[in-house]
Amino acid sequence: MTSPLQILILGHGEMGHAMEFLLKDRYELGIWEKFPSNDYPYVTLEDSAAHADIVLFCLPVNPHREVAQFIAPLLKKTCLCVSIAKGLDESGQTAAQIFAENLPVQQPYALLYGPMISEEIRTGRHAFAQLGSQDTAAFDVMQTCFNHTRLHIEHTFDITGISWSVILKNVYAMAFGMADELKLGDNVRGFLAVAALHELSQIVQAMGGKTDTPYHLAGLGDLITTATSESSHHHELGRKLAREECNDISGEGPHTLEMIHQHRLLNTQKYPLFQMIHAIVQNPRDVRPQFETYFKQIYRQ
């Protein structure tokens, strides 16, 4: 009889708790937290990384580089590193790019992206994701981990495509929150879904992703979830911006806008909805007129 997989969860926030909920009954879990409390038996990276079969990075993207560099010499050659981070770090890189640069060349890694609201996972509801990896072996491992749960996963080789799909959806989700706060109506919400997906698809292709990737779980699926859920942080950010509130406008979406601008990752002139959102995040004033100007720009009225 084979021993159960040893899984190391990095980060014990919302998604760390969700992964713990899904995996705790069948696997040996160790959980590492950078700022541990005294009421949980957290592990240390030094002791746990060397024994892990899977390392789940349930962390924001910014700490990925430091943590990956620290554990890289400790990992077994077969250990699979998986990230759920949906953002860009301070150098403008995705989690996949950080893994590729900082893990050993042959170290397997994957990205897990899709509509996975932590609160719903922890109440036993269904969730869905794409696992992006360079081969199907990583998918087989993760599918085995989740096949007794209500987290349903499918495989894709398009790591670049799902990375940018899930990063950009946080930007576009804010527009839905703005529109809802301004009570622009259901027709506008339908239009925004089409316009956002159109631009998202163009940007993903420009970044090297495949044409159809934005129309799957990491793109359209996660966009709709984030853009329409009242519990969504980025939907609420959009509402705050529409109210012309400037305080605490933070999150992966605003940070993505900042990194794309700072590192010149994208020619934003081609994407008017993206440009409008960026302008509002920078200066949340006259949001309703900016929507009107945007609609006129699109239809040349």
Model-derived segments and their meaning:
Residues 10, 14, 18, 62, ...:
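Conserved active-site and cofactor/substrate-binding residues in soluble primary-metabolism enzymes
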Residues 37-43, 111-112, 155-156:
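Short gly/ser/thr-rich secondary-structure transition/capping motifs
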Residues 4, 176-177, 205-301:
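NAD(P)-dependent Rossmann-like dehydrogenase/reductase catalytic/cofactor-binding core
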Residues 63, 74, 98-108, 126-213:
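Internal alpha-helical scaffold of NAD(P)-dependent oxidoreductase catalytic cores
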Residues 12, 16-19, 45-125, 142:
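Rossmann-like NAD(P)(H) cofactor-binding subdomain of soluble oxidoreductases
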Residues 50-51, 168, 220:
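Alpha-helix C-terminal capping/helix-to-coil transition sites in glycosyltransferase folds
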Residues 1-51, 70:
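NAD(P)+-binding Rossmann beta1-loop-alpha1 motif at the extreme N-terminus of oxidoreductases
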